[in-house]
Regions:
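PRPP-associated nucleotide enzymes
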Residues: 1-263
Length: 263
């Protein structure tokens, strides 16, 4: 008859997803009153649509599996696309790392702060940060030839003399991120930092970061890892999730608890 909160990031996705499903089943068979799956990093989130024929929509499949498993509620941080919430048949609490990042950016005391999005798809997220930080926004536009292969990139907006903070939901190979950072320095930016919620950091990511002109990459610990670059700094989501879980247990409004859930 207890409320059970299962905390499991799905990375690597397949093994950890299966483990989560088994834990949900175990809790259900033990007569748990409510089962909440706390998934800091939602694997397969980038498979949210069909970009070409004969490909799966992995995010929808995973949502179906979780919904059918007996879970009563999902809690996750910075989904790759907001519409993934609609894939589930159970309530989804979509939390935002801006609750952690905004304060950290404010503590930098940057004189000429401007927020940047590394692509057009992240412009909404960048605008939320800009509003919270009372800053302007610039957007990078890129032509991607294939996955993780970057074509030409341009900046919409001026960065000359600015301290740029790039905002994104995740960083994988860091190709887009470092190319954007170097382009901004070439266009007169004083400094470039990046805040990305999920640090996948695969392939040559660390090498790209070390070779680039980016000052610092700040990520959260939604994906457990040992980081091989002095440019990477990690912020824990533990207290953030703990406060959210406490609000759920007390039947309090999450949107009232966190400002970013009102954006």
């Amino acid at each position: 008859g207890a409320d059970v909160f299962l905390i499991q990031s799905t990375t690597p996705p397949s093994d950890n997803l299966m483990e989560l499903l088994l834990m949900i089943d175990a809790a259900k068979r033990a007569s748990a009153a409510n089962i909440v799956a706390v998934i800091p990093y939602f694997g397969y989130a980038r498979q949210d649509k069909k970009g070409k024929p004969r490909v799966p929509i992995g995010a929808k499949l995973v949502a179906n599996l979780l919904s059918a498993s007996g879970v009563n509620r999902i809690m996750t941080i910075d989904l790759h696309a907001d519409q993934i919430q609609g894939f589930f048949e159970v309530p989804v609490d979509h939390l935002y790392a801006s609750e952690l990042f905004v304060e950290d950016i404010q503590n930098l005391n940057l004189d000429n702060l401007i927020i940047a999005s590394p692509d057009m798809g992240g412009s909404k997220r960048a605008n939320v940060y800009a509003k919270l930080l009372n800053s302007g926004v610039v957007i990078c536009y890129k032509e991607r030839a294939t996955a993780n292969e970057i074509g030409d990139m341009k900046i919409l907006g001026g960065v000359n003399g600015k301290d740029v903070v790039i905002i994104d939901d995740m960083v994988d190979t860091a190709g887009t991120l470092t190319k954007a950072a170097d382009l901004m320095i070439e266009n007169g930016a004083t400094s470039v930092r990046a805040y990305c919620t999920h640090g996948v950091l695969s392939g040559e990511a660390y090498s790209c970061l070390d070779k680039s002109k980016i000052t610092e990459l700040v990520i959260t610990d939604t994906i457990p890892a040992i980081h091989n670059s002095s440019k990477v700094r990690e912020i824990s989501v533990a207290s953030f999730l703990a406060k959210t879980i406490k609000a759920v247990v007390a039947n309090e409004s999450i949107s009232s608890t966190w400002r970013s859930n009102n954006q």
